[in-house]
A protein has these predicted regions:
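Divalent-cation
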Residues: 93-106, 111, 122-134
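Residue-level marker of positions within ordered structural domains that often coincide
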Residues: 54, 122, 148-149
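Noncatalytic regulatory segments and standalone regulatory/sensor domains
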Residues: 147-176
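Cysteine-nucleophile protease catalytic domains, especially the papain-like/related folds used
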Residues: 2-103
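Structural motif
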Residues: 116-118
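Glycine-rich loops and low-complexity Gly/Arg-rich segments
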Residues: 120, 140-144, 167-170
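Catalytic nucleophile-His microenvironment captured as a short glycine-rich beta-strand/loop
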Residues: 131-157
Length: 176
């Protein structure tokens, strides 16, 4: 398992996402008729996180105007924490992770925060056909619901909300 290098807290009084994978509808920028591939998990994750919170993610896409190219490589496109604070009142900060990952993520709802967490996509069912049980690739998710007792997690990743359970739950949290 790839250990979480970054765990980010998104704090706003009692921040919660109430959708489930069964009823979640992705933001229109992630519909099947889009003309670009999902290649920036960070940008895609913020689009869906803001959308799931009932916020319009389009203003946050202004960060695309700051993309730069040095003649060989493009800069990595991402929303800046200050922009998210100004646009939506969301506080984005990195936490010093000292508890096991599962305990850290479980503590979020009690503290009124969501976490972005870097995990190994080997354990993410939504990556079937690419990395799921095939390749160890770092990616970022936002756990929305975690239930240790039934080994279940709902999470935002790329262009939607998904569910993992059982052995995948154990694997993503390093319980195996």
């Amino acid at each position: 398992m790839i250990t979480p290098a970054v765990t980010t807290g998104l704090a706003e009084s009692g921040i919660r996402i109430s959708a489930s994978p069964a009823d979640y509808r992705p933001h229109f920028s992630h519909t099947g008729d889009r003309i670009w591939p999902e290649t920036n998990c960070y940008l895609d994750l913020w689009i869906e996180t803001l959308h799931a919170l009932g916020l319009d993610p389009v203003p946050a896409l202004a960060c695309a105007l700051s993309a730069d190219h040095d003649g060989l490589q493009w800069t990595f496109l991402k929303q800046e924490p200050e922009d998210l604070r100004r646009l939506y009142g969301l506080e984005v900060s990195e936490e010093a992770v000292w508890l096991p990952l599962l305990e850290t993520v479980e503590s979020g709802p009690v503290r009124g925060i969501l976490h972005t967490v870097e995990v190994d996509s080997w354990w993410l069912p939504d990556t079937a056909g690419t990395a799921y049980h095939a390749d160890h690739v770092k990616t970022t998710i936002v756990p929305v619901r975690v239930d240790r007792s039934i080994r279940l997690m709902w999470y935002l990743h790329n262009a939607g909300m998904y569910e993992l359970a059982g052995d995948d739950f154990d694997g993503v949290f390093g319980l195996v």
